[in-house]
Swiss-Prot record:
Belongs to the bacterial ribosomal protein bL36 family. Pfam families: Ribosomal_L36. This is Large ribosomal subunit protein bL36A. One of its GO terms (cellular component) is ribosome. One of its GO terms (molecular function) is structural constituent of ribosome. PANTHER family: 50S RIBOSOMAL PROTEIN L36, CHLOROPLASTIC, LARGE RIBOSOMAL SUBUNIT PROTEIN BL36C. Keywords: Ribonucleoprotein, Ribosomal protein. GO terms for biological process: translation. InterPro entries: Ribosomal_bL36, Ribosomal_bL36_sp. The keyword Ribonucleoprotein applies. It comes from the Bacteria.
C-alpha cells in the first residue's frame, strides 16, 4: 500500500475507488495498491 497525495492508475487493471471519503486504487497487482493521504 502506497500513501500518496496524488493517486493515479498505474496500469489498465487499476481502478480508482472512493471508500468512506478516502480515494483508493485497487488492482490485481498488489504493488499498485494506493491510498490518498
Amino acid at each position: 500500500m502506497k500513501v500518496r497525495a496524488s493517486v493515479k492508475k498505474l496500469c489498465r487493471n487499476c481502478k480508482v475507488v472512493k471508500r468512506e471519503g478516502v480515494v483508493r486504487v485497487i488492482c490485481t497487482d498488489p504493488k499498485h495498491k494506493q491510498r490518498q493521504g
